Amino acid sequence: MCSSEECLIDKSWTSEEKCEYIKCNQDSCEGGGYLTWSHYVKCQYNIGVRVILIILGILYLIILFVIMSSIADDFFCPAISGIVSHLRMSESIAGVTFLAFGNGAPDVFSSISSVLTTPKPKADLALGDLFGTSIFVTTVVLAIIIFTKSFKVAIIPTLRDLIFYMTTLAFIVFCFLKFDKIEVWMPATFLGIYGVYVVTVIILGIYRTHRKKRNLKKKNKELEDFLSRPSSAASTTPIFGAMKLKEETISVSALFHFMIGYSQFIKNLTRANLKRTTNNNNNDNKNEKRGIVNLGFSEPYSIPSERKISTIFKQNTFETDLESLESLADLDGSDDEGREEKFGYAHHTVFTSHDQISLVASEIEEIEITTWRSWDWVWDLFNHLKSWPSRDEFSEMNIFIKIVTVIKVVPVFFFKLTVPSNEMSWCKPLFILHCFASIQFALFSIQIITLKPFDGSPGLWLYGLGFSAILAMVAMYFLPLSKEQKYYKEIYSYLGFLMSIAWIYATSNEIVSVVTMIGVVTGLSMELLGLTIMAWSNCIGDIVADIAVVKQGYPKMAMAAAIGGPLFNLLIGFGLPFTIAAAQGKEMELLINPVYRLLMLFLGISLVTTFVALFIQRFTVRRPHAVLLIFIFVVFLIFICLAEFHVLEWN
């Protein structure tokens, strides 16, 4: 009965026998978290209490998904953005490495947790989650994006991602058909495919940059020729008729963006406007999110046609160098990949990079602290640890966001207590708390807090406490109370990255534990639970973010995330944990059961459908394409249910 590779409970067993089986096979019947839900439920012989435990487990699962979403969006992604900024990585490299890792963190860590936390890896749960997420995103999420707005796709990036995706799927099918267990070279090949993908992105990015610079040099010369015309001609030429270069008019919106971005005068006005918006939110911007100022002006500005170009040039000084023109071309949107704007994702709302700065600035009130004797430092610490919105902000939320916000109050408090954030201002008391809380939670998250390095030794928690005390004393003596340190943001980016991983990893273990309990109680397979509960819950944030991105005018970015995101999750989520597990000597079977056949079949159908539809529609996605994707997903669900209940047998 013990050492079973799968948690298979016979319905004819008594309750005591089922409980003993769970205790004897915790590696296969539990998920690796601190709470052993299968044991709690199956070893409870009172039916009423058992039902209550199951309900509590489901509620706990919902809270865990909220925690996962919050830590990934509000702490992990900003930390990654800070690291990318510090390393000065190009957008193409950052987009397929750090930023993709940030977006796919829940899926990747769920896979790592289900594979590495037990001696007998749950490969079926990991693959079910990855495949289920892939199908859901490439059908439902992509369809929602298209329903929101029809648009012309970025041709080269979209085709690149689809080709790599279909190649990866073909390799998975090959492995399932030819082998019955996972060898170390199989997941390593996935990591190799990801390496080739990154190199391809870099090469295409270099080519695109070279092409853009060549075109911009040409436009630079033409613009200089235009500006060198006699001032009398320029002063009487309306802006809508004068800026014609090679029969291609530069939009007024792009020109206005250009002058705003490179005029110190306008920058100063923007800072003043930002300050006014933060402090006087209850006036004209009462219905907008407090502290948010869109410095990019997503809507085109209209300038009266009678305004003369010479007047504008006199009011705003700027240089017409190559770098400035590069920004002008990006804003004009003529590039195949569309406008390139760095995005932050916080509180289920997508903001541009400068918007997010405003958001953070509005959340924490600045307090000047001069001495420990005053109690200002207590109020400053309270503001930094505050995890609930103001009354005005809460009243403006809809009912769903209010519920999520209430759920997040306690978790966010512990996030702020243990995760250094590069978005918050310097707070020395909070740094000292981080010295203790962060180290203890890091040990707790990987379940070694009570581990004894040798016989007679105290647990690692005591060693961590001693190390924390040393750090705290150094901070007390050397760090100033109010002045922000030079590399504070950079250091907090890396520390926040590590602590966010600790939270995501611990949360993933608990999620797997609850999902495993549901499988034990209902008798449903791990594949079905992975491709439904785990996959769909991880996609809720994607839907919210992608719709927001589309509504802000960036549908190409949303579509790139809908295709490139699951590709990254599949390559890294399968390649990394299974490579480590195989290197450790763990045996993992490759069972091509009907569920896996359907997963691979319908994922291939969805990818091929999108690939062919792009050519048929001449790379402009429309609603019939979205309807077809929804139909594919509905048919997939029907077949999965038939296969799960053995109505459909695929031999």
UniProtKB/Swiss-Prot annotation:
InterPro entries per the UniProt record, alphabetical: CaCA_antiporter (IPR051359), NaCa_Exmemb (IPR004837), NCX_ion-bd_dom_sf (IPR044880)
Swiss-Prot/TrEMBL GO biological process terms: calcium export from the mitochondrion; intracellular calcium ion homeostasis; monoatomic cation transport; regulation of dorsal/ventral axon guidance
Domain of life: Eukaryota
Bilayer topology annotation: Multi-pass membrane protein
Description of how activity is regulated: Inhibited by the sodium/calcium exchanger inhibitor CGP-37157.
Record GO cellular component, one term: mitochondrial inner membrane
Tissue and organ expression note: Expressed in the seam cells of the organism. Expression is visible in the seam cells across all larval stages, and expression persists into the adult stage of the organism.
Keywords for the protein's UniProt record, in alphabetical order: Antiport, Calcium, Calcium transport, Ion transport, Membrane, Mitochondrion, Mitochondrion inner membrane, Sensory transduction, Signal, Sodium, Sodium transport, Transmembrane, Transmembrane helix, Transport
Protein name: Mitochondrial sodium/calcium exchanger protein
Source organism (scientific name): Caenorhabditis elegans
This protein's encoding gene: ncx-9
